[in-house]
Amino acid sequence: MKKIILILLTAVSVYGYAQQATDNLDLSLQQAIDLGLKNRYDVQANKYNLDIDENKIGRSEKEWLPEISGSGNMRYSPQLQATLIPAGFFGPDPALVALGAKSVSVFGLDLAQTIYKPGITVDVKIAKNNLELEQEKNKQAENTIKEKIALAYLNVLLKELQTKIASDDEQRYKEYADVAEGKLKLGTLIENDYLKAKLDYENAKVETQKAKQNYELAMDNLKYQINVSGGTKLTLTDNLESPAFSASSLAIKGDATNRTEIKQLVLQQQNNRLEITRFRQNALPSIGFYANYSRQFTYNNFDYSLSQWWSPFSYVGLRFTVPITGNFKNYDYIREYRVRSLQTDLNLLQKTADITYEIQKASVELSNATQNMQTTKNNYELSKVIYENQKQQYNLGSLLYSGVLDTEKSLNLSEQNYIKAVYDFLLASINYQKAIGNY
């Protein structure tokens, strides 16, 4: 009993340590994507489609294996069928004579081996092509999940920036309110101006609280996308200044042929050609080898211990199968897949043109968003300098609170422009990664 308790305590302590080890995660964007692909159940479920298609390849290849089967037939005839015996065999007159044994048993082994059947080889090629197609579909599903995780990760960075700016605004209005309170006590400020400053500070606190709430929601969404527990503390190691978001790292030349949509259409076209080949080969004859070895027991009962009544026999042969009317059906199937092939060619050309334009457009949007973010960031930094200057003027009494509010409009506009530019940049980076086939 003590041993069992000790084992349970050890297991609990190990589990607790494991939980503690996974409750804190430092994640870059790429690490978050890798973790999500590892943890998500839909990714794991999709991988079983690959196992199914791999099994189909093995099933097609096994068509070449010989078919070996055993059979048994035990028959008892209470009354044997009579056979007419002509005159001269058993007497001067014809007679009905029952020939044979009442008990007949035959046990044998049959072997059938395909020697020539062109369709099997093509079936294996089709199965392998379908596996490659399923791999590309699985990749497309993973790219969709990568995009969701990346959007969730970048949304946290955006909400973090909004929270920081809201906190800066709150601190700024707090300083205005503190100065106004001091002036009110000195009698150099009317009460209404003080109340305005206090109200603006309270409103700024509300905005900060809302920004923090949005940040927590964004973090919860990221945890959901990478499938970790809600109690896990995530620390994002990438930020807007990280090399991962630099213009040089994002400006990767895109190629439409790298997109899985193009690869799927190419594989679909290969499948069309293989189907045409398969139906053409259906018109060719099939050749098979067969053999049998059996032992027969004949007697009046089923006493198999009487070895003298056992007798073996065997045979071998070749079987030819030549389709005749099936060729009329094959013609319709061949025509259908020729039409599908033409259709796939056109879809491939259009999809290539679509993706080429998508890459070009996403590249321009990313370049513009990068420039706009840098410009608005400079304006945002300039607004901080303006704030320091006006704070000194307000402290010295050379600037009224109404003048402070006029300046705050410009400051708030700079902040909102910067946040919007960051949002556009993050969205453009996602769209570009998607366009070149990374997501």
Whereabouts are the PLM-identified features?
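Short segments within alpha-helical structural elements
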Residues: 206-228, 381-438
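Periplasmic alpha-helical coiled-coil/stalk elements that build and connect Gram-negative outer-membrane
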Residues: 27, 55, 138, 144-256, ...
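Bacterial Sec-pathway N-terminal export signals of envelope proteins
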Residues: 18-69, 73, 79, 230, ...
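Sec/SRP-type N-terminal targeting helices
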Residues: 44-48, 61, 115-142, 167, ...
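Small/polar, glycine/serine/threonine/aspartate-rich low-complexity segments that form flexible
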Residues: 20-24, 71-113, 239-246, 291-322, ...
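Bacterial Sec-dependent N-terminal signal peptides
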Residues: 1-29, 425, 439
